[in-house]
């Protein structure tokens, strides 16, 4: 481990660290240590931050590992103790570990320029990318826990995809965790990508209709934009094509608040006379570009892969194409939320280098073991989960179905928040208080 720096942001003490981890782990589930062969091959950086409140810098508080949403999400960068609601509460009770998951942020980031530099063929690139999924991420975390933090049990907090990682951690290394919190991110187990989109595509449609209901004039404006993009060759400021599909991808924000208002003001100045305004095209680019979040789209459908499966084969695209309301020519134009489509790998210059490997991955049937249903059924780790009833990204019904088969799990179902509730309100505070009241954190604070 190398400490890179330490500093304060208002109300928080922050330490930056980096450790080297194998690109490919050979580490049996539940084993105390990885196989020595893991360290014989290529290595990558794992960057993490240790965050404490300014008042508790030297306090011996228990550890909380934050598992970031994504996939392909780097750890949050706090501006102050108050800038992230869950963090402002967490540092009262814990030292918080923020990791940049492998391939993101400062952890040997994977982007199109790296893919080009590696110079591998499509199959080799696909195999390389498989090293950036949950089975590897959890082993990174476990390596950190055993080598840096003296094998101390820690609490985990998983937001969105971080909940998928939580279920993987509970499956693979259950003895490492004292308690877990999850916000908007219980995966459906057993997993099936097409099933997921069959549940979420209707939610995309409902969200679009809700938006048009709030701002009726926007329905015509969005349709007019789509008509213009269909009839003219329009380029975004970076030279990428501005397509109707790219316009539809603005719906990816609709699971957050205040997304409808953001969309309303985005299209408010879409036209300059008869033509699309430069400002709107810049907004379309900045809201839909994959620069800086390449793995979010590259790995999007493969977070539903576990062990041996049928080929995923562009599951979201298949469901959307079979739902005529999402055709580019349909009016009112339906907007799309969180769907990795083949078109974006052709149109978005940040993703084109990944396109050949995507076709390989979409046809693969063999994946790492991420979830152990038997282990989850006998789980005794307290898991407190916030399930957002109207969640557009992670269907609440599927979440509750999974939790019904996970031991010692406790769901708080609420329609007060959208998918980003942990960043917008006192969601973690509620879950923490519930766990405390049930005695689920008692052993952490016994001296």
What are these regions (language model features)?
Residues 1-7:
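N-terminal, polar/Ser/Thr-rich
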Residues 8-44, 50-238, 352, 369-376, ...:
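Gly/Pro-rich cap/lid or specificity-loop segments adjacent to the active site
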Residues 80, 266-268, 315, 395-404:
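Short alpha-helix in the alpha/beta-hydrolase fold that links the catalytic acid
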Residues 234-364:
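Alpha/beta-hydrolase fold active-site neighborhood
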Residues 245, 377-383, 406-408:
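Short, proline-enriched alpha-helix->beta-strand connector loops that line the catalytic pocket
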Residues 250, 380-387, 391, 410-411:
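Catalytic His-Asp charge-relay segment
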Residues 259-262, 391-398:
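Conserved alpha/beta-hydrolase "acid-adjacent" motif
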Residues 385, 400-412, 426:
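C-terminal structured domains
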């Amino acid at each position: 481990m190398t400490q890179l720096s330490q500093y304060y942001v208002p109300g928080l003490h922050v330490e930056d660290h980096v450790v080297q981890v194998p690109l490919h782990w050979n580490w049996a589930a539940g084993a105390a240590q990885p196989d020595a062969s893991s360290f014989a091959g290529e290595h990558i950086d794992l960057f993490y931050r240790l965050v404490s409140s300014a008042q508790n810098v030297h306090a011996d508080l228990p550890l909380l590992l934050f598992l970031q949403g994504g996939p392909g999400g780097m750890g949050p960068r706090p501006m102050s103790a108050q800038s992230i609601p869950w963090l402002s509460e967490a540092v009262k009770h814990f030292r918080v570990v923020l990791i940049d998951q492998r391939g993101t942020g400062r952890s040997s980031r994977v982007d199109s320029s790296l893919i080009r530099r590696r110079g591998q063929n499509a199959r080799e690139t696909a195999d390389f990318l498989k090293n950036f999924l949950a089975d590897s991420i959890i082993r990174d975390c476990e390596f950190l826990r055993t080598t840096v933090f003296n094998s101390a049990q820690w609490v985990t907090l998983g937001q969105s995809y971080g909940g998928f990682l939580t279920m993987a951690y509970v499956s693979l290394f259950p003895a490492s965790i004292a308690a877990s919190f999850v916000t908007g991110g219980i995966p459906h187990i057993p997993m099936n990508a097409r099933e997921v989109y069959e549940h979420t595509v209707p939610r995309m449609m409902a969200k679009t209709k809700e938006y048009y209901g709030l701002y009726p004039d926007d329905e015509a404006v969005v349709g007019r934009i789509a008509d213009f993009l269909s009839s003219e060759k329009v380029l975004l400021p970076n030279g990428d094509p501005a397509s109707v599909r790219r316009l539809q991808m603005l719906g990816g924000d609709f699971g957050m608040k205040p997304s409808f208002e953001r969309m309303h003001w985005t299209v408010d100045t879409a036209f300059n006379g008869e033509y699309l305004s430069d400002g709107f095209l810049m907004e379309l680019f900045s809201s839909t570009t994959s620069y800086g979040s390449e793995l979010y789209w590259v790995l999007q459908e493969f977070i539903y892969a576990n062990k041996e499966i049928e080929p995923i084969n562009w599951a979201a695209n298949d469901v959307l194409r079979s739902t005529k309301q999402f055709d580019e020519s349909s009016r009112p134009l339906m907007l799309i939320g969180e769907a990795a489509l083949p078109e974006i790998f052709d149109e978005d210059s940040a993703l084109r280098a990944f396109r050949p490997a995507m076709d390989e991955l979409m046809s693969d049937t063999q994946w790492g073991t991420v979830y152990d249903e038997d282990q989850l059924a006998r789980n005794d780790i307290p898991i407190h989960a916030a399930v957002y009833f109207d969640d557009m990204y992670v269907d609440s019904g599927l979440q509750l179905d999974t939790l019904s088969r996970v031991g010692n799990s406790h769901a708080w179902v609420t329609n007060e928040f959208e998918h980003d509730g942990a960043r917008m309100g006192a969601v973690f505070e509620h879950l923490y208080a519930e766990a405390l009241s049930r005695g689920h954190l008692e052993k952490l604070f016994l001296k």
